[in-house]
């Protein structure tokens, strides 16, 4: 067998969605991937993810496995707020392992102003997916998109939606600043 350090395993999961590494980590932690998925589902319930059931560590297809964009946004928010040091890893655009450089699938990290990370995914049933976070003017937005036909389409649509949401926040802030209170 091969060996991989915990740090490199984490980077492989974040940057390249290394499904084989997800299985190895799950088996190391819980004995089996199935037991690990049960722990993941329990944690999901504990943080309010009511519509998520995990059946494996990687997110690869399983008829009994499901989630929603809302639940993934809750998980993303929890990661950002409860584990800021670990969340910082989700900004990583590339890493080197065994002399090879691996690059992220999250192209918005390079092109979207204020981007600070999170995670891509893909399965045939729900297409190209992305949980994405950006900060502008000290305001953070988390966007989750499922169903892209291509990674490029997913990125364009989520970029558009995030930009519109930030513009909406700016309008709300401007309105609040212009409200006059009568004495």
Question: What is each stretch, according to the model?
Answer:
Residues 1-70, 80:
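Active-site-adjacent loops and short helices of periplasmic peptidoglycan-processing enzymes
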Residues 49-53, 61-66, 70-183:
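Domain-terminus/edge residues, biased toward the C-terminal soluble/receptor-binding domains
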């Amino acid at each position: 067998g091969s060996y991989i350090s915990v740090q490199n395993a984490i980077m492989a999961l974040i940057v390249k969605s290394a499904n084989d590494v997800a299985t190895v980590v799950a088996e190391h932690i819980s004995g089996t991937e199935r037991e690990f998925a049960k722990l993941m589902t329990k944690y999901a319930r504990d943080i309010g993810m009511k519509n998520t059931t995990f059946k494996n560590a990687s997110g690869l297809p399983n008829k009994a496995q499901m989630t929603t964009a809302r639940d993934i946004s809750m998980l993303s928010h929890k990661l950002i707020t409860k584990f800021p040091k670990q969340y910082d890893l989700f900004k990583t655009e590339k890493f080197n392992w065994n002399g090879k450089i691996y690059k992220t699938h999250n192209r918005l990290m390079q092109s979207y102003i204020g981007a600070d990370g999170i995670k891509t995914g893909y399965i045939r049933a729900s297409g190209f997916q992305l949980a994405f976070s950006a900060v502008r003017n000290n305001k953070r937005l988390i966007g989750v998109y499922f169903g892209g036909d291509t990674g490029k389409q997913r990125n364009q649509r989520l970029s558009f939606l995030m930009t519109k949401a930030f513009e909406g926040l700016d309008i709300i802030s401007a309105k609040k600043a212009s409200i006059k209170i009568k004495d």
